[in-house]
Amino acid sequence: IGGGAKSDEVALEVTKKLEGKTLEKDAFSFQLLDDQCNVLQTVKNDENGKVKFEAIKYKEAGTFKYTIKEVNDNKPGYTYDANVLKATVTVEDILGEKLASVKFEDSKKEFTNSYAAKEAKLQLEAKKVLNGKAIEAGQFEFELKENGTVLHTVSNDANGKIQFPKLTFTKEETRTFTISEKAGDVAGVEYDPNAYEVTVVVKDNGQGQLVATASDADNITFTNVYKAEP
């Protein structure tokens, strides 16, 4: 019994909490140590966060001190609780019977970990083609929009490459972006009116890292045509 009830044996019990992710059974390990720092038991949490050690039976009266700590196995994305919990078991001899009681220094008796996958970054690109004339760096402008709001405006380089600043994603989600050319007024140029929709799906890879994947993002090409005015 881990909460102060009387018996000749004690099963120490604490609680595991996890922030940022659903706690799974056997996700974390915990050690029970005696006052000489010897590891007596190692157990894992259940699906409800309960951490229960096997009962210790006492044959003699006395005071017994224990330390409970979590094993930091460095799982990616997790921040571990470095605190230790201290418990004192007092065993009394009453009329020949051993009666044990438990007292924890910290009444909460909890270990709290947190999980946060590292952010993902993704750079969207496109290509600019100009028929009828050599393309120049900075000649045309392009917009990256989300829900009608312009996030970035960039221009092509001398090879027609279009690169938007990297997008940052901090959680699992699905977002839709639109890439289009900003209509200009260069004489003799017929602008490409097309807009391309790109869907980005962000997933946790289970190793502490978010991964962003774009669909319909390959081979986005804007083609303008130049015809010299008569």
Predicted regions and their residues:
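Solvent-exposed loop/turn and edge beta-strand elements of beta-rich ligand-binding domains
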Residues: 1-230
